[in-house]
Curated annotation (Swiss-Prot):
Disulfide bonds join C114-C136, C135-C174, C142-C167, C165-C202, C207-C217. Belongs to the phospholipase A2 family. Group III subfamily. InterPro entries: PLipase_A2_dom, PLipase_A2_dom_sf, PLipase_A2_His_AS. Pfam families: Phospholip_A2_2 (PF05826). Its cofactor is Ca(2+). It comes from Hoffmannihadrurus gertschi (Scorpion). This is Phospholipase A2. The lineage of its organism: Eukaryota, Metazoa, Ecdysozoa, Arthropoda, Chelicerata. Toxic phospholipase A2, which may catalyze the calcium-dependent hydrolysis of the 2-acyl groups in 3-sn-phosphoglycerides. Inhibits both skeletal (RYR1) and cardiac (RYR2) ryanodine receptors (calcium release channels). Probably blocks ryanodine receptors by generating a lipid product. Keywords: Calcium, Calcium channel impairing toxin, Disulfide bond, Hydrolase, Ion channel impairing toxin, Lipid degradation, Lipid metabolism, Metal-binding, Neurotoxin, Ryanodine-sensitive calcium-release channel impairing toxin, Secreted, Signal, Toxin, Zymogen. One of its GO terms (molecular function) is toxin activity. Gene3D superfamilies: Phospholipase A2 domain. Residues 20-105, 211-213 form a propeptide.
Length: 239
């Protein structure tokens, strides 16, 4: 199931006769390579004119966004109360009005690990924002339950990979500890996209029979917290 959201911003001219509507349609789909969703968005601009009590609307521009960095930037500057959900058919209608685009980056700009999958050549390969990338790399290799699989007695019946809550907390802390003005911009994009826009929730593991001398939890039982973000809630709805 896909998530479709429309974020609407209206900018009125001084005489309120002509206005510009900027609409962002967002589609999140499951990734087979990581816990991150594959994000796709369409930003469209319409001019709206009101004359003699009648309104007319004309498309002025269209852009398909596949970069998490661009999508996060658009979502961050859009008031949350203007977020609306539309149907998949409506999304396909607007996509059909845009020109096809080639493959776009699916990681946050300046990183190789922060996104659906990764662009790294090897484990040591990091992007420009290497400190942010280290956080994402560790998160990618942390304890998880892939979609459809069972671990700790918990079956992941959702669409996305489910992460251990300890991994989510460590990821959030790792990002929060990063300083630097420009780096913080990348941190904001990563945190907003993953925790707020997506928000798949996580699972806690209880060691009912205690831990082993090596601190392992061989008979652990996991409990899912439930989705925390609008993206995961809509996509997993009805599963």
């Amino acid at each position: 199931m896909s998530l479709i959201i429309v974020l609407v911003i209206s900018v009125l001219s001084a005489d309120a006769v002509l206005s510009m509507d900027n609409e962002l349609y967002l589609n999140l789909e499951p990734s087979q390579r990581s816990s991150w969703p594959v994000a796709r968005a369409v930003r469209m601009q319409f001019s709206k004119r009101s004359e003699g009590g009648r309104e007319s609307r004309k498309m002025q521009g269209c852009q398909i966004l596949e970069s998490l960095n661009d999508i996060a930037r658009e979502a961050l500057r859009t008031p949350r109360h203007t977020t609306k959900r539309i149907s998949k058919d409506e999304m396909e209608f607007f996509e059909g009005r845009c020109l096809s685009v080639g493959e776009s980056e699916r990681t946050v700009l300046g990183t190789k690990w922060c996104g659906a999958g990764n662009e790294a050549a090897n484990y040591s390969d990091l992007g420009y924002f290497n400190n942010v990338d280290r956080c994402c790399r560790e998160h990618d290799h942390c304890d998880n339950i892939p979609a459809g699989e069972t671990k700790y007695g918990l079956k992941n019946e959702g669409t996305y990979t489910m992460m251990n809550c300890k991994c989510e907390k460590a990821f959030d802390k790792c990002l929060s500890d990063i300083s630097g003005y420009f780096t913080r911009k990348a941190v904001s994009a990563v945190k907003f996209t993953y925790f707020t826009l997506y928000g798949n929730g996580c699972y806690n593991v209880k060691c009912e029979n205690g831990r082993s001398p090596s601190n392992e939890c061989p008979n652990g039982v996991a409990e899912y917290t439930g989705e925390t973000g609008l993206g995961a809630k809509v996509i997993n709805f009805g599963k």
